[in-house]
Structure formats: structure tokens, C-alpha cells
């Protein structure tokens, strides 16, 4: 009995394993949160936001960096954390933006309308060949759909044997020729008989001269 009592208190050391299991879900949740934070935002890029902000402004002298920061902050962009990105974006978008005043990222900026027009034309040229290529398969599909109508020509060729009725007319024409010839032969003996009596009358008139 004493041995059984001594062996009974052994189960308590299993508690730290249970604590480890409870700690694991917390670590997994933290890792998921970090992964979510690393995912890129689905919104527009910094350069796109800058271009939209400059295009929206009506100032003739251009938009300053401070005004750009204000408009970006109003749109929900964290300007303080992404200040370096904002400056890089201004350098990248120099083709679409014209720096009216200042140098570098500091200064005022305007939209480069000529550059935008050239980009629009280039995009339109790219779209035109793609549209032409898309039309070609559609035209080819229409031709293949129309091609099964060709068997109708075979049916027209099958109807052509009806033209063989013409030899029947040729068979009728010899019958007419044979019917006309006997009439001519019948008339010629009658003329010969009528000519003979005239010769006999001439012979009788000769003795009167003596």
C-alpha cells in the first residue's frame, strides 16, 4: 500500500507541456499578423498619387512639396514614415512632372503635358495592332463557319442530268423529214402523166398539111 501511495503523485509534471501548447497559438497569431503587414497595399502607388495630386491642383505656379504632402496626408498616406519614398517617387516621375521652382525634391512641380500626350499616343498605337489581331481570328472563325455551305454546289451538279432531255428533240426531227419526202415523190408522176397527152395531139395535127 505504501508503494502505491508513493507512485500516485507522479502525474503533475505534465503541466508545462500544456503551457507550451497554449503558447504556440499566440506565436502563430503573431506570425500571421507579421505576414499580413508585409503584404503590399492594393491601393495606388506613391508616384500615381503624386501625379493625381498635381493634376488636381489649379495653381499656375505649380504645386510645392509641402502642398503635395498635405494632399497625400489627406488621402490617408503616411507622409512622415514614407518621406524618403516620396522623394524617390518625385525623381522617378520627373518625366511626367516639370520642376518649375527649386531643385531636387524641394520645389514646385507641374504636369508635363507633352510627355503625357506622347505616352497616350504610344498607348493608342499599341492598342491598335492588338485590336487588329483580335479581329483577324474573328474573321477566320466566320469563314470557317461559312465553309460548310459548299455541299450545296454538289447538289446543283446532281441536278444537271436533267439536261439530257434534249436528245428527245433530236429524235423527233428525223420523223418530220421522212414524212415530207413521200409527198414530193407522189407529185412528180402526176406531172409526167399530164405531159404525155400533149405530145399525142401534136402528132394528129401533122397529116392535115398534106
Swiss-Prot record:
Compositional bias ranges of the Basic residues kind: 143-153, 160-180, 193-210
InterPro entries for the chain: H1/H5, Histone_H1/H5_H15, WH-like_DNA-bd_sf, WH_DNA-bd_sf
Renumbered residue ranges of the record's region Disordered: 1-49, 101-210
Main localization of the protein described in the UniProt heading: nucleus
Span of domain H15: 42-113
PROSITE patterns: H15
Job description of the protein: Histones H1 are necessary for the condensation of nucleosome chains into higher-order structures.
Pfam families: Linker_histone
CDD domains, per database record: H15
GO molecular function: DNA binding; structural constituent of chromatin
Similarity-based family: Belongs to the histone H1/H5 family.
Protein's name according to its UniProt entry: Histone H1A
Domain of life: Eukaryota
Stretches with biased composition (Low complexity): 26-45, 129-142, 181-192
One of the GO biological process terms: nucleosome assembly
Localisation per UniProt entry: Nucleus; Chromosome
Protein keywords: Chromosome, DNA-binding, Nucleus
GO cellular component: nucleosome; nucleus
Amino acid at each position: 500500500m505504501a508503494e502505491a501511495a508513493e507512485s500516485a503523485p507522479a502525474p503533475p509534471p505534465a503541466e508545462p507541456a500544456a503551457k507550451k501548447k497554449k503558447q504556440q497559438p499566440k506565436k502563430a497569431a503573431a506570425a500571421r499578423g507579421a505576414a499580413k503587414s508585409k503584404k503590399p497595399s492594393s491601393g495606388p502607388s506613391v508616384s500615381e498619387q503624386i501625379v493625381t495630386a498635381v493634376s488636381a491642383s489649379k495653381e499656375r505656379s505649380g504645386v510645392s512639396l509641402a502642398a503635395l504632402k498635405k494632399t497625400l496626408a489627406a488621402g490617408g498616406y503616411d507622409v512622415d514614415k514614407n518621406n524618403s519614398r516620396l522623394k524617390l517617387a518625385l525623381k522617378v516621375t520627373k518625366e511626367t512632372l516639370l520642376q518649375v521652382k527649386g531643385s531636387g525634391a524641394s520645389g514646385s512641380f507641374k504636369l508635363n503635358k507633352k510627355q503625357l500626350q506622347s505616352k497616350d499616343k504610344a498607348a493608342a498605337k499599341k492598342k491598335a495592332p492588338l485590336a487588329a489581331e483580335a479581329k483577324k481570328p474573328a474573321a477566320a472563325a466566320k469563314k470557317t463557319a461559312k465553309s460548310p455551305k459548299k455541299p450545296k454546289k454538289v447538289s446543283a451538279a446532281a441536278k444537271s442530268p436533267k439536261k439530257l432531255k434534249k436528245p428527245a428533240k433530236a429524235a423527233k426531227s428525223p420523223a418530220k423529214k421522212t414524212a415530207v419526202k413521200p409527198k414530193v415523190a407522189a407529185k412528180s408522176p402526176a406531172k409526167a402523166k399530164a405531159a404525155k397527152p400533149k405530145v399525142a395531139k401534136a402528132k394528129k395535127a401533122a397529116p392535115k398539111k398534106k
